[in-house]
Amino acid sequence: METKTPAKKATVKKTASSKTQTKTQAKIPAKKNAAKELKDLFEDSLKDIYWAEKALTKALPKMHKNATDKKLQSAIELHLAETHVHVKRLEECFASLGKKAQAKKCDAMQGLLDEGKGIMEETEPGAVRDAGIIAAAQKVEHYEIATYGTLAAYAKVLKEKTCLKNLLATLNEEKICDKLLSKVADITLNSKAIKK
């Protein structure tokens, strides 16, 4: 039986490491309909967040129904009303670009909504589930904040004034909602979720 010398072991490790690096550093080929300009990326990203907002109009009522804390229920109601406004603003943005509002499945939002559903399934109704709902809702908020911030930056560079105005208004509301959820969690919910 052959024993591997330190030099042979190092060669084997180096070869395996080289293969891993090659795979992780591989270039991803662009699809046929890939964005070629910032305007294309902007429009594609608008379709993505449009889908996300429309999906939220269906998911938020489920969160509301499963929440037990009155302040959390109120925060979800407010966010649902704002989400309908966000959909309208996105439709205005598409119209200002001369495009029909079109949704493209947002895998990130789908993942966040699936995770939120999972949290509700894995927690008993009450304070613990409410704390989980807040965590799931804030992950959604953070995704939306990142997306609207990026889209506003694109709109500014592209000189799309109507879109910029609408995107900044929505971005501001998403930040306020995130702070409201933090306040609800900090004031009552997280401490109620501790079993005494």
Describe the function of each predicted region.
Residues E2-K196:
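Amphipathic alpha-helical hairpins
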